[in-house]
Regions:
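C-terminal catalytic "cap/lid" subdomain
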Residues: 1-176, 180-204
Length: 204
């Protein structure tokens, strides 16, 4: 579900809901290799030594970086940000944040030139940020695995693998559940990044 929720066309997350509620395992098969046993999705599983069980990526994202000193102390900052998106009928995919900054990740196909100009102007007016910039043509890579909870250094291994290939990270986000890590990179580096991560976690 983490891979689907991240916006990648692996499996629609709502398709799992009936099976999840009834505690029914689901098997995903490969149409190009129907005799392969496939992937079993269950409500619980035994965590083996491998910390990562899946890697997926998708293109067509843009990120908007907003920075403002003492942003975390400003009441209603997040609400005003979301109101700007709502007024322009824009949905966001991810919103990683720090103490003084926040990044909005959107699907690029929502952003015509007119919409983008209006969005940036309204964010500037409503939020009065110290810095506001948009980055286009991003790919998002998601790695998932319940074993990441017990394994120290998965993030370090991932970033080291990307660094060896001279792949710059535009953004990184890890949820508090510790079962997934998302990386944002330039789309032209997507294939190289996927191969580097596969070599790191599935080298055998």
């Amino acid at each position: 579900r983490e891979l689907a929720y991240a916006g990648f066309a692996v499996l629609h997350d709502e398709a799992l809901m009936p099976a999840y509620r009834a505690n029914i395992p689901v098997v995903i098969k490969n149409t190009n290799n129907p005799h392969h046993p496939g992937t079993l999705i269950t409500t619980s599983r035994k965590v083996k030594h491998a910390p990562v069980v899946g890697i997926a990526s998708d293109q067509g994202f843009a990120s908007i970086y907003i920075s403002k000193y003492l942003m975390n102390r400003e009441l209603g900052f997040g609400r005003r940000l979301l109101e700007v998106l709502e007024k322009l009928a824009l949905s966001y995919e991810h919103m990683p944040s720090g103490i003084d900054d926040i990044t909005i990740v959107l699907r690029e196909d929502q952003l015509t030139t007119e919409i983008e100009n209006r969005l940036m102007a309204q964010l500037q007016e409503v939020l009065a940020p110290d810095e506001l910039r948009i980055t286009h043509h991003l790919s998002m890579i998601m790695i998932v695995g319940e074993g990441m909870r017990q394994r120290i250094g998965v993030t370090a291994e991932s970033t080291m693998a990307l660094a060896k290939e001279k792949i710059n990270l535009e953004m990184i986000n890890q949820g508090s559940s510790e079962v997934s890590i998302m990386f944002g990179i330039k789309k032209e580096q997507e294939e190289k990044a996927i191969k580097a991560l596969y070599r790191t976690f599935f080298h055998d």
